[in-house]
Amino acid sequence: MSNTTIGKFITFEGNEGSGKTTQSKLLYEKLLDNGIKAVWTREIGGTDIAELIRDIVLFKDMSITTELLLIMAARYEHIEKFIRPNLNEGKWVICDRFIDSTLCYQSENSEEQQLILELHRKLLDNFFPDLTLIINVSPSIAMQRIKIREIHKNTNQLNKFDSRNQQFHQKITDAFIQVSKLFPERIVQINGEPMIEDVSSEVINIINNKMKVNLLR
């Protein structure tokens, strides 16, 4: 089920280097510009405890099951301490990654995806976004953007997902396409390869249509 609070919960998903973080922040800023109360957050993270878990998951080697359980713990903390309270205050919560990333990164097949969804139902009260935007780019473009991003950061410290090969990024891209078919009423796919401004305009169009608002550009 979607959240039943008075605010709106919008998530952005996609491969590393897809531009989802940029687009999520642009939407957050656009909401504020239009007088809509909003907050921006991310997963793994969003609270002090969840951010500590983020560093462990992104930079330490572990089994996929350990990753999953740590992420679920971080998500529970995030929902209870940040997401739900802000939604209950009537704010829009814009989140960079949520359950769909877990379905893509922490599973190898449909059976494992069903296990994740069962955990989500039991542990997190089946809490889903009102709308999810998946930003799609080809794996080759994703890897180019990752390299450019790290140069601009002036650091060689890639997290373990950033540093994977093109085959891995293709697998994640394919997984997001498959997940979008599981939740067609909630998920909209967007081509993230055009200019940032063009992708942002498409995001605004989708938000206006799906959320019944009239955000000015």
Swiss-Prot record:
PROSITE patterns on file: THYMIDYLATE_KINASE
GO molecular function annotation: ATP binding; dTMP kinase activity
Gene3D superfamilies: P-loop containing nucleotide triphosphate hydrolases
Entries under InterPro entries matching the protein: P-loop_NTPase, Thymidylate_kin-like_dom, Thymidylate_kin_CS, Thymidylate_kinase
Keyword Cytoplasm in record: no
Reactions the enzyme catalyzes: dTMP + ATP = dTDP + ADP
E.C. code: 2.7.4.9
Pfam family, one: Thymidylate_kin
Superkingdom per UniProt: Bacteria
Matching PANTHER family: THYMIDYLATE KINASE (PTHR10344), UMP-CMP KINASE 2, MITOCHONDRIAL (PTHR10344:SF4)
Name listed for the protein in its UniProt record: Thymidylate kinase
Gene: tmk
